[in-house]
Design a protein with these regions (language model features):
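Short cysteine clusters
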Residues: 66, 86-88
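N-terminal pre-ligand scaffold of iron-sulfur
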Residues: 2-81, 94-95, 99, 112-130
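Short Gly/Pro-enriched turn/cap motifs at secondary-structure boundaries
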Residues: 106-109
Length: 130
């Protein structure tokens, strides 16, 4: 796994900031623990951002592109419960921590999901990359 703070070489640094009103129907699932939502607003992340409520008013936000190769037509992660799966190699990641599940033991370096900042203010969730 990469050292803390080291960014992924396959995914570019995309600066963005988006505010999600949790009262709106599109984001209401985020009011419940364990319900992920995909944000596909243009300019938010490389291929979008998955956001999940992890409990106790804490949220996690992750890039929707697979972190283990350059973005392409199959690299958009597909939602599977509280996990996401790469359409290219089938790599699976948990949205609670961003960690890759069943990491191959072949000596190659594998990356966990690229994380973004998420802060809750009243009923508005700000997701951003400074």
């Amino acid at each position: 796994t990469p050292e803390y703070g080291q960014r992924n070489p396959y995914l570019q640094e995309v600066r963005f900031s988006v505010e999600l009103n949790l009262n709106l129907p599109a984001y209401a699932p985020l009011q419940q623990v364990g319900n992920p939502v995909l944000i596909t607003t243009t300019g938010v992340g490389t291929q979008g951002v998955y956001v999940i409520n992890t409990g106790f008013d804490q949220f996690r936000a992750f890039e929707a592109a697979c972190p283990n190769h350059a973005p392409n037509t199959c690299s958009l992660l597909k939602l599977s419960g509280q996990n996401v799966v790469c359409g290219c190699e089938g790599y699976t990641y948990t949205l609670f921590t961003g960690q890759m599940l069943e990491r191959p033991n072949d000596g190659k370096r594998y990356y966990d999901l690229l994380s973004y900042q998420a802060e809750l203010f009243a009923n508005t969730l700000r997701v951003y990359q400074p």
